[in-house]
């Protein structure tokens, strides 16, 4: 199967969100019965109108920060944080003075149960984790292979 590339980001978004949403653009990257993946870009003072959907939703903030609400709770959320919105519960997200980017993953199944089943222990959500021994190892050495004329290309040293 060939590699499939899906572009997102600036130039690939369109206005997105439920009715009443202001200042948000997005790009659906994948959508099927099992779930969907969407990139959202919130401008300054943007807001996603409170809404619910029948799927579990993981709201993964990848840049900037803003606010999220689930039911009656409200909290600040920053890049590197993920919020789990349960199905059929009102949820929203918004920004004030700064923009925010997020990846939204909607799943037909509870992601906490998926993680437990992938770990092989079949533990229910909220169960105590199994103790594991400390891993040993290190990253493999990567030889430095800079070619003449490559000074301005790629990642910094």
Regions found by a protein language model. Give the residues of each.
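A short, N-terminal "cap"/entry segment at the start of jelly-roll beta-barrel domains
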Residues: 1-35, 83, 115-157
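Glycine- and acidic-residue-biased ligand/ion/polar-headgroup-sensing regions
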Residues: 55-66, 71
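Ligand-binding loop in jelly-roll beta-barrel domains
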Residues: 87-113
């Amino acid at each position: 199967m060939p590699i499939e590339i899906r572009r997102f980001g600036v130039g690939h978004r369109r206005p997105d969100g439920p009715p009443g949403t202001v200042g948000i653009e997005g790009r659906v990257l994948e959508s099927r019965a099992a779930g969907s993946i969407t990139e959202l870009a919130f401008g300054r003072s943007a807001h996603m109108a409170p809404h619910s959907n029948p799927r579990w939703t993981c709201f993964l903030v990848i840049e900037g920060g803003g606010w999220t609400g689930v039911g009656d709770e409200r909290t600040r959320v920053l890049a590197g944080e993920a919020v789990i919105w349960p199905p059929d519960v009102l949820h929203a997200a918004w920004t004030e003075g700064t923009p925010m980017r997020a990846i939204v993953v909607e799943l037909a199944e509870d992601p906490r149960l998926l993680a437990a089943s992938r770990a092989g222990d079949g533990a229910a959500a909220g169960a105590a984790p199994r103790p594991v021994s400390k891993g040993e190892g290190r990253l493999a050495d990567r030889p430095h292979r800079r070619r003449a004329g490559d000074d301005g290309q790629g990642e910094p040293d």
